[in-house]
Design a protein with these regions (language model features):
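Basic nucleic-acid-binding alpha-helical/helix-turn surface characteristic of O6-alkylguanine DNA
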Residues: 1-27, 33-52, 58-164, 168, ...
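Short glycine/serine-rich loop segments
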Residues: 301-343
């Protein structure tokens, strides 16, 4: 089973979505209209533009960079990528009780069309709603097995109706039967929104091991590498470190936090570890060049290696590689996109 990453729909699907004014595509794309110079949310109430006048962007920042103005009707710069309230409620219910099974008939009793919630989960988690529930139950069963519970007890307690069905689902996730995964671990993952786009956070029992924007290049490669390094499977589930990091990021984006205290778990080489430690020494609102970072590390000639280690940082913002710029003052690279790097640097300077 693939790790959850943002699944991007094609042009036709996007154009049909704006015709329906479909709020389930919030955070998936932005619509820009060539004839008006304005960009909108997928759910904007304005008249649907002709297909030849439409261009789609992943983020509002990209539309701004290309000269488009935010729509005054749908206000696409406000609360970008917010998860609909009814989906937040359902996710909270499932995480509080992973044994719960919400079926299509249950959704209809809540006046929720199953196809709508299925489409939202496919767009934002690359899995169906029922697939998401199944992974939560697998995660719960795995925790029980790790604690010494019988496999059959864990399977039925987790809501599976047959042991064979549980074994098939378990093997699809872990690649092995329950009896051969005692040495494995689970990294819990959560998707949440920020003012500059949605993010994924992963956590082990030790701490946060990944914090990335959902549209980061090579994100699936990061998931795969992290899983191999920690001999773990990434699954939705609860973890106190995930609650901790979301709380501190809310404070950060409100301008009320300049240092983070959430524990981190950063597997890597000794050199990478030292580079990431130096990154965390760069003060809020300041920048360093790659040369200055190499000097601070005590390896002034290792500029290229330092840049490579920065690029392998899996924990955005908290390990602040966005504070490293080129010697000439230009932004240089950033896995989350240069528009976000500029936003973060401007924001930190403005909130010193």
């Amino acid at each position: 089973m693939k790790n959850p990453i943002l699944n991007k729909p094609g042009f036709e699907e996007k154009y049909n979505a704006i015709g329906r004014k479909d709020s389930l595509y919030e955070g998936v794309f932005i619509t820009a209209v060539k004839t008006t110079g304005i960009f909108c949310r997928p759910s904007c109430r304005a008249r649907k533009p002709n297909v030849e006048n439409v261009i789609f962007y992943d983020t509002a920042q990209q539309a701004l960079q290309n000269g488009y103005r935010p729509c005054k009707i749908c206000k696409p710069m406000e609360k970008q990528d917010e998860t609909p309230d009814y989906i937040q409620t359902i996710i909270k219910e499932l995480h509080q009780n992973p044994y719960l099974r919400i079926k299509d008939v249950d959704l209809r009793q809540r006046d929720i069309e199953p196809s709508q919630i299925r489409r939202w989960f496919k767009s934002h988690h690359n899995m169906t709603f029922h697939g998401y529930q199944r992974l939560l139950r697998i995660n719960t069963a795995f925790s029980g097995i790790k604690k010494g519970e019988a496999i059959s007890s864990s399977a039925f307690d987790s809501g599976f109706e047959s042991l064979s069905g549980f074994n098939d689902s378990y093997r699809a996730v872990f690649g092995q039967s329950p009896t051969h995964t005692i040495d494995k671990s689970v990294l819990n993952i959560v998707r949440f929104t920020t003012p500059i786009g949605p993010m994924f956070a992963c956590a082990s029992d030790t701490g946060i091991c990944l914090l990335e924007f959902t549209d980061r290049r090579m994100l699936e490669t990061e998931f795969s590498d992290l899983s191999k390094r920690l001999n773990a499977v990434i699954l939705p589930g609860d973890n106190p470190h995930l609650e901790h990091v979301q709380f501190e990021l809310q404070e950060y984006f409100s301008g009320d936090r300049k240092k983070f205290t959430v524990p981190l778990h950063t597997p890597g080489t000794e050199f990478q570890q030292s580079v990431w430690a130096v990154l965390q020494d760069i003060p809020y609102g300041e920048t360093r060049s790659y040369t200055q970072q190499a000097i601070a590390l005590g390896k002034p000639k290792a500029i290229r290696a330092v840049g490579s280690a920065n690029g392998h940082n899996r924990i955005a913002i908290i390990i602040p590689c966005h504070r490293v710029i080129a010697a000439d003052g230009s932004l240089a690279g950033y896995g989350g996109g240069l528009h976000r790097k500029k936003w973060l640097l401007d924001f930190e300077k403005a909130t010193l």
